[in-house]
Amino acid sequence: MQTPTPQQLMQQFAQKVARTRAYRYTWEFQERDEKTGKLSAKQIYTLEFLQPHYRKMTIVQRDAFSNGAVLIHNPDLDTKVHARKGFIRRVYERNDPEVARFFETDLGYILKELQRLFRGAKAEPVKSVQQGQRNGYQLVFAPPKDPVQRVSLTLERADLMPLRIEYADAKGTRSLRVYTEYAFPNLTKDDFTI
């Protein structure tokens, strides 16, 4: 299989996102602390997503209070985000800063952000790379006129799911997501009950 051009890879990823009905993935997330300039401790999340808008996220590792919490959004039942951890239950408005990033975790959101940054960007040729035990395509590009100065996107070669996404600026890495597991389960609306 021939290595795609940067434009072809972005187009193939967009097609993958459009045709993927349901998925589950786990990722490790770190972002730079602006006070120290260092990457934060690793956070781990699992997302289950069913088109067009059902989502459930489990906080695997973040802090003692949040670990094990599950956030669910099912707009057929309610416009709010429901969180539970054991017997504790909370309800958040969709625009509450506490849960704002919850809506930035699905492939559709990630694709839109990557497309925005890719428009007019200077891209390096796509490379074949290893990410852990998986074969991937790595696309590195420099967005024009944006605080993000460099994006490194690695997609799994066989099914084009993300393996790694790194955003950097003049100070270095701003945020890093490493996707450790993914699957395509047969999810239904019933999997997103509140």
Q: Model features per residue range: what roles?
A:
Residues 25-27, 54-59, 78-84, 141, ...:
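Short hydrophobic/aromatic-rich beta-strand segments that constitute the beta-sheet cores
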Residues 7-8, 111-127, 177:
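A short, amphipathic edge element
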Residues 1-54, 123-129, 190-194:
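N-terminal leader/targeting segments and the immediate start of mature chains
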Residues 7-10, 14, 108-111, 152:
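Extracytoplasmic/secreted envelope proteins and their assembly/folding machinery
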Residues 17, 103-118:
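Short, solvent-exposed helix-to-loop capping segments enriched in aromatics
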Residues 46-106, 173-176:
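An acidic-aromatic
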Residues 19-22, 47-56, 72-79, 134, ...:
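Short, solvent-exposed coil/turn segments at beta-strand boundaries
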